[in-house]
Amino acid sequence: MRARLTSLLSGIALGLVLSAFPVAAAGVLQVGGTGAAAALLAHVGKPFTQQTGIAVEVKPGLGSSGGLSALAAGVLDVAVAGRALSGAEAARGLVPVITIRTPFVFVTSHHAPPSMTVPEIANVYTAEKVAWPDGSPVVLILRPREDADNHCIVQYFLGKGDVLGRARQRAELPVAVTDQDNAGMAERLKGSLAAATYAQIILEQRDLRMIAVDGVVPSIETLASGAYLPTKVLYFVHPLQPSAAASRFIQFLRSDEGVRALREAHTLPGVE
């Protein structure tokens, strides 16, 4: 019931958000999608605007699926998704053109979190009561069933089985609908533990500590070296026939200045 209600409310909110946005206009680049990329888009948008004179407007609150729907509807010029496109989305003429990587992390409001092993993180999802070393409770924050981050949680930490499904049956666990809700809830709740995207947490200057996994601290350097494995891939997507602003934006991101801006936004190139 809670999962269905969360999904329904997300759908209603998305409809209201899309209805408030005009169709993409010339001279302005309309971008949006996963909340994990909102601050990143604002960051890379500044040098793009300085170089081209094209203003960048980041539409909040869409999520990956909502951003791709808005792109197909002509509301956005470029969307950033936290997952690969579905067959139906590709059939609507959407094309992934650039991928970037950033560490996929667990964050907490705890002042001095320990390094955790992968099994220890998985245990937080299965055990009813887990405590930090000082005895204070670990408060796990979940994401909605359809959220793209769930794939990373399962891939890198939980493995096979419906561990997330069983965790959702625990009424005491809070659910954060958006990436910004997730980070905000993690800041507010004492002893929180939440999955998140490294670039978002750093760029939004969140008052959170990142969990070292098997003794390895997440960073762009440890991701690049292969020492830190959990990875979040972000997909820049535009229509089969992109707007002039979208084409210039993608061209910028592929330039030396754009690659530098993406690196400053705590991401690495992906595989195109």
Model features per residue range: what roles?
Residues 25-100, 104-272:
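Exported/periplasmic ABC-transporter solute-binding proteins
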Residues 1-4:
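N-terminal secretory signal peptides that target proteins for export/translocation
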Residues 8-20:
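Bacterial N-terminal signal peptides
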